Amino acid sequence: MEGPFKRKKKEEPRNMIGKNRRRGRLEDKTENSAKKRTEEEARSYAESHFLQEEQGRDNEKNDQLTKEDILKIRQILEAEEKEKKQQELQEQDEFLSDTEQRSEKRKRILWKKQKENGNEEEVIEEETSKPVEKDPRDQAGINRQILKVAYLFAGLFLVLMGYIGYFVGADSKNIITNSRNERQELFAKSVIRGNIETSDGEVLAKTEVAEDGTEKRVYPQGRQYAHVVGYTIKGKYGLESAQNYNLLTSNANFFERLYHTLRNEKSQGDTVVTTLNSRLQKAAYDAIGDRKGAAIVMEPSTGKILAMVSRPDFDPNTLSDDWAYINSEAEQENSRLLNRATQGLYPPGSTYKIITALEYMRENTNYKDYHYNCEGESVFHSVSIECYNKHRHGEEDFYESFANSCNTSFANIGTSLNKKKWADLCEELLFNKALPVSFPYSKSSFVLNGKSDDEEVPQTAIGQGKTLMSPLHNVMITSAIANGGVLMKPYLVDQIENYTGGSVRKFTGKAYGALMTAGEAEELTAMMKQVVEEGTASYLSGRSYTVAGKTGSAEFKEGEPAHAWFTGFAPADNPEIAVCVIIENVGAGSTYAVPAASKIFDAYFSGK
């Protein structure tokens, strides 16, 4: 249409500058297109309106009404177009950084100014000449990302270096002693495997070399040290495995090693000197005899293992020939290759009353006032508990209950204990935990906890039920009592020597830590002395030395004789050795284990 509805055509902008001008032209074109569409729609509407209202209206009135309608329509359409455009720009801005968003905003302001003053080029030149300032926060964010990546790579590098360092340094011996490490053969090609000896010079293992260079590992003491020394066929076991690195290392002087190298000869490996005492080892071996069981002797003040015996045993000199028989079905029950001293797990029987007594003392400061009347048999939490042979002990106090090893009294004590605290004590005493030793062992177990049924308490209190313990663990707790509550880490190797007897490395005892207070250890010592003086271990009384100990008879199968236990130390007031003995399936600890322990004590004190 002509007249008032015809818009004057605006001149196109001249010489746009760079990308900003192209962006401005795009926005201007978009706006002009919107306005053009609005004009056309307005005309169309007006023409339609004029045709409908042609009759009954004059031209002037029609013109005024149509103009108002067109303006309203234009305003509505322009508002919709503007809103749509604004939404598109917002969606686009979501993909831009803060700096880019500020740049886009400046461009839009630029074109707005351009349209207002009509001086496009000056505005563009002025605005585009200003540098876009970068937000320091953006740079800080980038720096943080760079630092994160740098820290990540630095951390990975340190982990890698630590991993390599661990295997090269700290764990190199474990790698070398691993029986699957084929590089051990490289050491064996240049070194004759060294000797293993007792602390008093008895040779336990050596390598004999024939004239043709053939080597043979020989064990002069045979069965007596079989489990502790081990073997080198069918893999390695015992000290032969644990000390493989030292046995295949030669610390002979440089010129001697050079001499052997030039002659294409092997150097003699170092000697491993153990803490074992030959006299005590023989006494322990003879004390167990032909029965199944174990004995272990420890020096409480240092942690030295002075003797370690397990029976049934095997002959390491003929093990290659005997291997099939030892592992046959007929021999499975004997488990000859199992070191019962460290890997055997048994119900501790009444030796566990040491721990029950300790927990009772901790929970009851008036424990000395305890009294109980034993009738030989009683029921606790629906569980019937009997004393050995249903013997009636009558009226007893706390110390007498312990000395007599009264089952009903200790079941009664157990029912008064806090199960959670009791379990915590056992954890402190290393039940369910790793023992601080460098040789293979089995972990003792104590399953009672705060949520356990009350029916489990009476049996647990007297060392029955589900509690299991190794002789090694038992002698460790006994040694801690003897050492004022402090446990020394058990160890088997005293020193490493070169083949001429020169010391290469000396090992000393290290404290693990206190398992109990000195006062608690002193009180338990007094109770254990009473066991020997007037209780179940009276067989050991009246000697030239005093003993503090505890017996145990652990039932493991209905109708079968119990396992016999004894654990103790001597001299009672200034302990030098701790002894633990278990003999399987024989009967009472006082009848079998105590006499066996006495042979070991006698051997020690007679040799002083």
Identify the function of each model-found stretch.
Residues G3-P4, D200, Y259, S301, ...:
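Beta-lactam-recognizing serine transpeptidase/beta-lactamase-like catalytic domain environment
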Residues M1-Y325, R336, L345, Y370, ...:
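Periplasmic/cell-envelope proteins involved in peptidoglycan metabolism and beta-lactam response
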